[in-house]
């Protein structure tokens, strides 16, 4: 069966969406009407176009954190247009271009229509080598598909044990589904990006403060940012990727007099708004933060009261072994959270609990009962002294005066903060930056005050929905969790268990964000059965044995929450799923019925949502249906007003129980992280292969996609037509590369062919190709073939930016433009131009 049978062809889309598919092929309304005019429906289409709409209140649901409310205009059962819904609350007013293009996501030529089975697959003879771009599929009935999936689950458990099942879900849908409930009931393993993707910064911050998890830490709510006097945006292009939520608050702060510093190697939309742009060399972020600390120490700009009362800066450290002095050596009954400090008034040590201020020495060295001790802050100051701005300026590619200005603004202007995002942690040892900036903010006392900022993601705890035991039902078998960094070995080597069955959803994992893609493809060949549920036929579904067509967000009812604004949205169904697509909830319910858990899933998903709404006093169906969005908490919140979550209740300026990081370019015995220490792998100037691969390679986020979602939307492809390599003209001309030529980007792991684009806003020595493109979008190779899947011992996070490459002009055969009508080669949008239905 061909892909034109597997996917929604252009003619199919037009039949299902009529003129709702306006512009699907990039031709606009008139061409759409002309294409539809192969029957007597053209007149009806025009009449429908001029009719009246029903406005359905729903919401966008990707992993951008927005969950923006949308008005969907429906006529004759078809979506005609999408507009931004405008709630009354200022905290939630902006949508983006992506949300306005959902028409072309619902009525898209890549839509999966029916359940499919790979023709060369059977339970007894899976033939995994037949998976891939050339795999052929045949249509099967839903009952047959669910029977095959359920039988595969039971067979794997029977022959290899319950942990032979692997459940995978990405972040492609922010709604509440039955996925987690089913996997808990059935058991097995689940992979989880808690370790593996974008977790470095949060890990480092958490280790110092005891707060947050492994992603971005808690911070003041966005509506409090207006009180900031200095905002440092570190490694994030908020004004391109998060403007609908975060940008307005930063602009409000600037209008109120705040200084905006942007640390980014690329001149971004956000850098353009800065009072001070620091175009740092990639991988030098910890160097810069330590230089700022050195300046603050040298000029006595640190917050003494905060350091004494809310950090372990005055804690006494043994010089012989680096451990904190034991409180029991000073008093017989020390408080649980006590630290030993030196009281300058009494001239003796004493033990004090958290949140205690007093005449405690911040610096100094003493001998107590024959043991030489110094304060934790003394050790930190000694470490920072090796990184004065004048020395770091050359290392980081910055002006020393600019480093000093940034440090001075942060330390002296009043409350402020540092707003990192995930990009700054996309290096092998990126967690050290998390430790470093958390410590830097402790020096300036920027915790627990109005105007403090600690992350790009504001924290609205009240926006969560209480789901009770829905995701942890009674009698559940439970699942074991493996971070993405361990799943590759799990699949490749069967360590620690043989994995034979995989169910995936909400994810295009093999198209985006899984480095060393070929290793993943090889590892998945050890699976007997791969099942994937998706809206579209993606690079990942092409590796499946059974494909289940999922419904678009506008075809399902759901509730949406997010921790980054104080609102909850109700996703109303605009129309039923097209063709035989199904809401993931009903797919899970169908499997549950076959696996003996049917009684755990109500027949109607609305009954589940009704249970959640009735259990939450803030919500009512009347309000949800009328407005689509309900504000759950609009009170500005200041984070870190209570004791910190560390053992001492204080920020750990000096960590005597620090982990030892091990990995490339580090000593054989590793590096202990009592205080921040700049660690680098491939970004280091003296990296072993730096001469062979002299260019650092980033893959930043694009404002035209959320990961790989929206990569197949024709309207957006008219603007962002194909992958390109941002390269500084100096680097290009040195290699004989003209602007617009196709180039081969390569290293010892792989290569990709893309079009070169001169960009003066990217510094020499650095190149970039935005992430999120599908495999078919590249002329040859793949972006993720270049990235190492190696992770460090402590960080355990994929280091997408820790990558070096060389760039050469591509072969002559690749120099012709292979993109037609804004569609990539091989896409359904192009391949079905002349199809028959």
UniProtKB/Swiss-Prot annotation:
It is an enzyme of class 1 (oxidoreductase). One of its GO terms (cellular component) is plasma membrane. Mo-bis(molybdopterin guanine dinucleotide) binds at residue 200. It comes from the Archaea. Dimethyl sulfoxide (DMSO) reductase catalyzes the reduction of dimethyl sulfoxide (DMSO) to dimethyl sulfide (DMS) during anaerobic respiration; it can also use trimethylamine N-oxide (TMAO) as terminal electron acceptor. Required for anaerobic respiration on DMSO and TMAO; subunit A is proposed to be catalytically active. Predicted to be exported by the Tat system. The position of the signal peptide cleavage has not been experimentally proven. It is a peripheral membrane protein. Its cofactor is Mo-bis(molybdopterin guanine dinucleotide); [4Fe-4S] cluster. PROSITE patterns: 4FE4S_MOW_BIS_MGD (PS51669), TAT (PS51318). [4Fe-4S] cluster binds at residues 60, 64, 68, 96. Disulfide bonds: none annotated. Induction: By anaerobic conditions. Its expression is under the control of DmsR. Its EC number is 1.8.5.3. This is Putative dimethyl sulfoxide reductase catalytic subunit A. Belongs to the prokaryotic molybdopterin-containing oxidoreductase family. CDD domains: MopB_CT_4. Disruption phenotype: Cells lacking this gene fail to grow under anaerobic conditions using either DMSO or TMAO as terminal electron acceptors. InterPro entries: Asp_de-COase-like_dom_sf, DmsA_C, MoPterin_dinucl-bd_dom, Mopterin_OxRdtase, Mopterin_OxRdtase_4Fe-4S_dom, Prok_Mopterin_Oxidored, TAT_signal. Residues 53-110 form the 4Fe-4S Mo/W bis-MGD-type domain. It catalyses: dimethyl sulfide + a menaquinone + H2O = dimethyl sulfoxide + a menaquinol.
